Amino acid sequence: LAWYHGDRGAQRVTGTELLILALLLAIGGGLLWRLAAAPANVAAADAAKPLAGASTPIPDKSIAVLPLTNESGEKDQQYFSDGLSEDLITALSQFAGLKVIGRNSSFQFRDTKLPSASLGQALGVAHLLEGSVRRAGDVVRISAMLVNAADGSTLWSQHYDRPYKDLFALQDDITRSVADALKAKLLDGSGARVQSERPPSGNLEAWNAWSRGRFHDAMINPADARKAIGFYEQAISLDPRYARAYASAAVSWVTLAGTFLSGEEQRQAYVKARAASDEALRLDPDLAAGHAARGLLLQWVDFDWTGAEAEYRRAAELAPADALARFTLARMSATLGHPQQAISMLREALTIDPRNGSAWHWLGWTLAAVGQVEEAEQAARRAVTLTPTSPFIAAGLVIIQIQRGENSAALSAAQQIPADIWRSIALAFALQGGNDRAAADQAVKSLIETSADGSAYQIAEVYGLRRDPDSMFQWLDRAWDTRDTGIGRLLTDPFILRYRDDPRFAAFCKKVGLPAVTDAKAMP
């Protein structure tokens, strides 16, 4: 959303942002992190290079599960091999002291030819789990191998031929073998709860339907979103107590409603999302994905920030090894005016998901919010390296360069962004720091003419940069009228915070339900 992938843009609704956050909130699966993923040819050395001054020792008890190769020869079986890979990630995350890299980062190395040492460095792990899977009728064949990343030596390997009906037992065998090899132990009773993606009945076809739903969720279009919901409903019909499927359905309904629907159809979709979320938590009160889905509804449908924060915090408590849970809570912490706390959480999340371009972007934004602009720019550049095709990520670098006073560099970077609403927004920002006042004025005028409803919050920011508080507060009011998700950035926004002592700032915070107190700094 605004604070996750982009505020508002060319779409008539929250669009990409809502889609990203909604899919982010499928705790333990990471449905659509591929949207923020780097192309496979991004250099591993670039991704592995730490920020200046950062220490990145690789713990011995650390592992990345590379996506199992689909050897069935059928592309429509990709969901099956990916589902098995993700289930292994989830299962290994239940072991205390074992660092398990998230799906977003490890899946970027699908079919990679990079040597194991480069992979280990890029992902920050000492071990790699790789292999292949083939399903032929009622038989599943899996080859798995645990590799020492530093030298490529094999620590454990096994080939399995099992009946399809024994799939869950087979996955458990692999998990136990890897855990034994790494001398890892299951989590204790510290408040965490094993977060299984399997149906409580053990119905394989229900899990299969749920996995298909996740696959279609990744297609990013309304037809596939509806197909995903259909598969989740099929999973529920096969196991009516499948809480995880209800949570996934809730997230998909929010995604569909916020990205592709409007009017009464949108309202009804939100009703269905809320019902599915409630049922997920009724069936399993300790399901992290259920709390995350409820948080999504509270945040971006009800704009209940504190209620959403409580749900995200509970999800993170239940799934402490999940980078996505940490990331979501970190961004909500920043939304509520605690950027220093958010920075710590974002750093923790990045140890588990080091190639997450969006997380690097938000680390940069949040560092800049507390005045650490040099390190913020380094993080923003890392984000651009990892997500080179994202106009939003590129615009984030422009805004940080403006905060550093690098106006020429900011304008040059903005001009390199491909045609997109975020190019227009970046140019509107960058031109304010130059000497061509006519161009600066025209950039704001053009942004208003083309995207007044979709970019009301960004227009308010530009007026803050222009030191025009009257226009800034007028556009903030319009942003609230249109429920612009950019409002979630308010308490970490250096342009808006220039006027934090203006009585209108406290009044606006009260209206939108945010505290008027923040640790962030204003732009001078």
Can you annotate each of these PLM segments?
Residues 14-17, 27-419, 452, 493-494:
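Acidic, proline/glycine-rich low-complexity intrinsically disordered segments
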Residues 399, 427-437, 487-503:
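TPR/TPR-like alpha-solenoid helical repeat scaffolds
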Residues 468-497:
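C-terminal structured "cap/appendage" subdomains that terminate the fold
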Residues 490-524:
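Terminal, low-structured helical/coil segments at or just beyond the last alpha-helical repeat
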